[in-house]
Swiss-Prot record:
GO molecular function, one term: ribosomal small subunit binding
Gene Ontology biological-process annotations: maturation of SSU-rRNA
UniProt-recorded name of the protein: Ribosome-binding factor A
Primary localization: cytoplasm
Transmembrane segments: none
Function text: One of several proteins that assist in the late maturation steps of the functional core of the 30S ribosomal subunit. Associates with free 30S ribosomal subunits (but not with 30S subunits that are part of 70S ribosomes or polysomes). Required for efficient processing of 16S rRNA. May interact with the 5'-terminal helix region of 16S rRNA.
Subcellular localization: Cytoplasm
Alphabetical UniProt keywords: Cytoplasm, Ribosome biogenesis
Domain of life: Bacteria
Protein source organism: Syntrophobacter fumaroxidans (strain DSM 10017 / MPOB)
Length: 117
């Protein structure tokens, strides 16, 4: 299977965004954010950034984190532009990744089934 350029750019973006969130972004709304995946379109114009929150998160915390990420989008693109030497930097859109919550729910159900046996 071929490793497309969009996949390489997505991996690079994920690493750099994680570093930005850890070291440069000071907004408390995004302090618990973890970047789980990034999907970049083949034309490298758009990137969907999937994130989750460490620990149990309420709906309000999820909305607050999404708002914080969207408010810092311009700063992140500026910093990513300095770090990455790409002709065009994709437009970023942030999406909450609920797959970890779903996996946790399935795991709890399986444990409950084994407990009842």
């Amino acid at each position: 299977m071929e490793y497309k350029r969009a996949d390489r750019v997505a991996d690079l973006l994920r690493r750099e965004m994680a570093d930005l969130l850890l070291r440069r972004i000071k907004d408390p709304r995004v302090s618990k954010v973890t970047i789980t995946a990034i999907e970049v379109t083949d034309d490298l114009q758009n990137a969907k950034v999937f994130f989750c929150l460490m620990g149990a998160a309420t709906e309000e915390e999820k909305r607050s984190a999404a708002l914080g990420l969207n408010r810092g989008k311009g700063f992140m693109r500026l910093e990513l532009g300095k770090r990455l030497h790409l002709r065009y930097l994709p437009q970023l859109s942030f999406h909450y990744d609920s797959s970890f919550e779903y996996g946790d729910k399935i795991e709890r159900l399986l444990k409950e089934l084994h407990k009842n046996e």
